[in-house]
Amino acid sequence: IMTRDKFFETIDKKVGLENREQIEWAYALAKQFHREQMRDEGVRYFEHCRDVALVLIKYGPTNPDELIVGLLHDIYEDQFVPRGMIKQLFGNEVNEALKTLSHEKPFYKRHGKIVKTSESKKEYFDLIRQSSVLVRRVKLADRLHNVLTLEFCKPEKRIRKIKETREYVLPIARETDMRFFKAIKNRCDYWDRKDHGK
C-alpha cells in the first residue's frame, strides 16, 4: 500500500527536495478537496491523483510543478476552488495548467460566485494538444492510469473511454512521448480484445 511516507520517500529519491513543501501542500489539498469522492473501483478519488503523480515519476524525468499539477489535475473540474488560491500557492504556470486540464472551466463572478463552463471534447483536446509539454504529460499520465483501471467500470463507459482515447489522446501521446503512446495503446488494444474480441 502506498502511504504518504512512501510517496514522499519516492519523491525525495527520484525528484529531490526542490519545492518539497509545495508538493506537500498539493498532496494535502488534493486529499482535502476530493475527500468525499470515490472512484468506480471503490477507492478514494485521491488515490487516483496520487497515482497520476507516480506515473509521471515512472515516465520521468519530471519536476515539482508537473507533480503538483498531477496531484491537483481535477481540482477545478470537480471542486469549487476560491479565486486566486492556486495561483497564490503555486504560481501562474501551475494555475493555468490546471485550468487547461479542466474540461469544466471556473468563471469567477461577483460576491464569490463561481460558474463552470465547458467546451466540446474536440475543443478540449485541441487545447491540450497545443499546450505545454507539462500539460500534455499530465493528461497522458491521467489517461494511462484511467485505462489501467477500466475493469471496474461499466462496459459501455469503458468502450466510450477507449474510443475517446484512440481518437484524441493517442495523437497527443505520439507527439509527446512514445513511452506513453505505447503504454496507452497497449491497454486500448487489451480492452478492444476483451470487449469486442478484436
Task: State where each predicted segment sits.
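Active-site helical microenvironments for divalent-metal-assisted chemistry
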Residues: I1-K198
